[in-house]
């Protein structure tokens, strides 16, 4: 099961690499949305190095999911895209497993 989940996550991450979503240049610690557009086309998980999830809040009304690709580009992912939702679900499950692990 973990192998399949990893493969799906990797597949999703690579698809993020091909994304057309862009992030705003981060200027200090400004309280505003970081994504000016989002990408919904699939990115293969092998192309994704990291994924950052920012919940909505006073800084931005949108949930923002920013994937850092292996080439260093940052891509804003569409949180409503089914493949992006799978990535988020996998990350949350992994975080839950890590938090349940004994010290």
UniProtKB/Swiss-Prot annotation:
Record's GO cellular component terms: extracellular space
Subcellular location: Secreted
Entry annotated with the keyword 4Fe-4S: no
InterPro entries documented for this protein: Chemokine_b/g/d (IPR039809), Chemokine_CXC (IPR001089), Chemokine_CXC_CS (IPR018048), Chemokine_IL8-like_dom (IPR001811), CXC_Chemokine_domain (IPR033899), Interleukin_8-like_sf (IPR036048)
UniProt key word Disulfide bond: yes
Keywords of the record: Chemotaxis, Cytokine, Disulfide bond, Growth factor, Secreted, Signal
Induction: By serum. Expressed constitutively in Rous sarcoma virus (RSV) infected cells.
Matching SUPFAM superfamilies: Interleukin 8-like chemokines
GO biological process: angiogenesis; antimicrobial humoral immune response mediated by antimicrobial peptide; cellular response to lipopolysaccharide; hemopoiesis; inflammatory response; leukocyte activation involved in inflammatory response; leukocyte chemotaxis; leukocyte chemotaxis involved in inflammatory response
Pfam families listed in its UniProt record: IL8
Signal sequence range: 1-16
Cystine bridges: 33-60, 35-76
PROSITE patterns: SMALL_CYTOKINES_CXC
Family: Belongs to the intercrine alpha (chemokine CxC) family.
Name assigned to this protein: Interleukin-8
Origin organism lineage: Eukaryota, Metazoa, Chordata, Craniata, Vertebrata
